[in-house]
Amino acid sequence: MDMVTLGSTGITVNKNGFGALPIQRISQEDAVYLARKAYKAGIRFFDTARAYTDSEVKLGEAFDGIRTEVYIATKTAAQNAEDFWKDLHTSLTNLRTDYIDLYQFHNPAFCPKPGDGSGLYEAMQEAKAKGMIRHIGITNHRLKVAHEAIDSCLYETLQFPFSYISGEQELELVNKCKAANMGFIAMKGLSGGLITNSAAAYAFEAQFDGVLPIWGVQRERELDEFLSYIDNPPRMTDDIRAVIEGDRAELCGEFCRGCGYCMPCPAGIEINNCARMSLLLRRSPSAEHLSPAGQAKMKKIEGCLHCNQCKAKCPYGLDTPALLARNYEDYKRVLAGEVKVQ
């Protein structure tokens, strides 16, 4: 079993974290079942957020009575101290607990610090002093903010996208966190569904002893894949290296990661899927994407207002309107039978 310690927090768990964003899409009963199954199999780290609708409520029911046996991380996207306290109290109620193991600022546009005028970090410190939270973390998609968080020495963990299609800049963050004794939580280990080989994804993450990947799970078969890696963790082999190199050749560069920070779109476009449709058509079953419902979603691209809000919000600096246009043209060719996909 591969284990990881999150820096100075002392939180030590097996190298399979449970990402609870997807369970907001399934029923309470199914979500509770999955979370409990994960716990019974040995997963101990569960990551959610105030922004993930009812995800916290579902975890709260799942761990009622066994709270001290799991580590729960959640997040606040509050922009001021008043909203911070509202979020924290709501999360504690939803999770049926009187403390949160790791409380994280959720993708802020800046790195909260004492004296910055927002009152956010001071609120974190007060919550920790009161025993309402045990450790302070930050999540982000921006390299600048991530580096600032590490350099500040104010945070015990950083959660950032990291997968085998990440580049040298993300790897630098991993190494920098290790040097600072700061835990690194890897989100988007499957790159929003574009990486389809979970064994390769796991083997890559397992190379970094200070990294805890959290896998987004909403189906039992997905959970079972990762549970199988607890006792039989995949290792880097020539075959897995070949898979990784093939995916890097296809996926590296300008493509949508599906993070959703561009949403909502004033024209109603489902940007986080439409802007990567060319990849989804080729890396997942295409029938659903080509259905009447899928066609209706893609057709909304024709109503793009070119307001550039999505471009301004993209943490990866993508020209999102242009990316949408390219994906729509490719989609129409696939739909017309001019281009073949599986």
What are these regions (language model features)?
Residues 3, 35, 56, 60, ...:
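Generic structural signal for well-ordered alpha-helices
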Residues 29, 79-185, 190-193:
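Glycine/proline-rich, positively charged
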Residues 37, 41, 94-95, 152-153, ...:
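Structural motif
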Residues 6, 18, 46, 59, ...:
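Conserved, mostly hydrophobic/aromatic
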Residues 44-49, 73-74, 134-137, 157-161, ...:
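Short catalytic-loop micro-motif centered on adjacent basic/acidic residues
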Residues 69-72, 155-163, 234-240:
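Short hydrophobic/aromatic-enriched beta-strand-loop microsegments
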Residues 1-70:
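N-terminal binding-site loop/beta-alpha segment at the start of enzyme catalytic domains
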Residues 43-44, 172-186, 190-342:
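Structured C-terminal cap/extension of enzyme domains
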